[in-house]
Amino acid sequence: MDNNKIMIVGTGNVGASIAYALINQRTAVNEIVLTDIIAHDAEGEAMDLRDALAVAPSYVKIKNGTYKDAKDCDVVVITAGAAQKPGESRMDLLKKNANILQGMIEQIMDSGFNGIFLVVTNPMDVMTYLTMKYSGLPAEKVIGSGTVLDSARLRTRIASYLNVNPKSVHAYQIGEHGDTELTLWSLADTGGQKVTTMLKKDIRNGISDFVKNKAYDIIDKKALLTMVLPLV
């Protein structure tokens, strides 16, 4: 990164959690700009996060701003959009969030931004494609969060069956971040052993289904998912 400056668009639970994670990990980031369609929400989050700097492991400049501040940002993280509600699939959000996205991307590009977009907003795969389309940036400059969250859930679930630390499990969900995602069992291992030799097929199938539906279960219970993605 040239300026070590990141903009987070959307200061709801996910956006705020990403900002919080950045100031609590020793990263290369030295400036965070928060922006939201509700300007005073971004201002309030910036004020709250600045107070945390007194006890954070490193100093990061934090401010609220507008899309114009994207001009010299290295990365713009897109978290803005309607949140998934109980009973909704990620694809149910498409029309609402696609409409929000286009105007947002156009304003960011008007600032002169030429960095990298990191897209978190659901349905993430489609929103990542639309960000590339609306921005005109090459594919290597528009990145989705992918199945990194799903893979973390997979490792945790496998670890619970094998009674090991999730960090010692190497396993991946692939494909869409959504209902068609798949578990790459052939590469899953822990401690040098293939998971397929330790867990029967019916258990593995149950784990795959559990991981695929985990988001719906969490949303039914607490409405929002904010803990894992900011850390990964």
Where are these regions (language model features)?
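Rossmann-like NAD(P)(H) cofactor-binding subdomain of soluble oxidoreductases
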Residues: 90-155
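Short glycine/serine/threonine-rich phosphate/pyrophosphate-binding segments
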Residues: 14-19, 86, 124-129
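C-terminal substrate-binding/catalytic lobe of Rossmann-fold NAD(P)-dependent dehydrogenases
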Residues: 135-141, 150-232
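Conserved N-terminal Rossmann-fold NAD(P) cofactor-binding segment
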Residues: 31, 35-72, 88
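Conserved NAD(P)H cofactor-binding loop of Rossmann-fold oxidoreductase domains
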Residues: 80-82
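NAD(P)+-binding Rossmann beta1-loop-alpha1 motif at the extreme N-terminus of oxidoreductases
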Residues: 1-43
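N-terminal Rossmann-like NAD(P) cofactor-binding module of classical short-chain dehydrogenase/reductase
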Residues: 74-77
